[in-house]
Structures are given as C-alpha cells and as structure tokens.
Regions:
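N-terminal assembly/attachment segments of tailed bacteriophage virion structural proteins
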Residues: 1-111
Length: 111
C-alpha cells in the first residue's frame, strides 16, 4: 500500500494553506501522513489532533530531508470516520507558536 501524504503549508504568522483534498480512508493506518512545509526543521514541532470522538492526540513531527526538499512529517490517525481538527505547535527555547486550526476528513471504509 502506498503512503497517503497530504501537504500543508504554514507561514510565519501561523496561517495554514492545505491541499484541496484533505481526506483519507478509514483503516489507512501507518500510511497516512501530513507533510508540513514552510517551517524551520530545527524547531521541535508537534501536531495536536482532535478526533471525531473528542480525544486529543499529540504527535511529534519528524524531519524529512530529501536534499532540496526538507520538511516535517507526522503520521495521522485514521481509526474512525469523521472530521479531525489539527493545530501545529512549534516550540523553541524562548518561543511557542501555534498555527491556525485546520482539518482533514476520514471517509468510512467498505463495510
């Protein structure tokens, strides 16, 4: 199964631009990623994700370095269908900044 990567761009003010199609399928475990562009990879970056059931999950983003293409990446949960809300949090020694909240959807799988 191929990885399902959705691209997110964050500017210095925290504004978020996302791909047009921000949906995954239920059950796409371990293959669904957010690729986060536009942020400093030397800063600790976490994704705070609210599931459709209201659970809050915090995941640390990893660095991906493909030469000219450097970005952060995080594996996102796709356990249940519905709308997931995400906020990206960057933490350095003297500053914490948060992105605007954006969302992705998980479509139900074949029953």
């Amino acid at each position: 199964m191929l990885d399902k990567i959705k691209k997110v761009y964050i500017n210095n003010s925290g504004a978020v631009t996302v791909e047009e199609d921000m949906s995954y399928n239920a059950g796409d475990k371990n293959v669904s990623f957010l690729q986060i562009n536009g942020i400093d990879i030397s800063i600790l970056t976490q994704a705070k994700i609210k599931t459709p059931g209201g659970q809050i999950i915090t995941k640390t983003c990893s660095n991906v370095d493909l030469g000219k293409n450097v970005y952060k990446q995080v594996l996102v949960p796709c356990d249940e269908s519905g709308v997931y809300q995400v906020q990206i949090i960057q933490s350095s020694r003297d500053k914490v900044s948060c992105s605007n909240i954006f969302q992705y959807t998980v479509d139900p799988g074949i029953e």
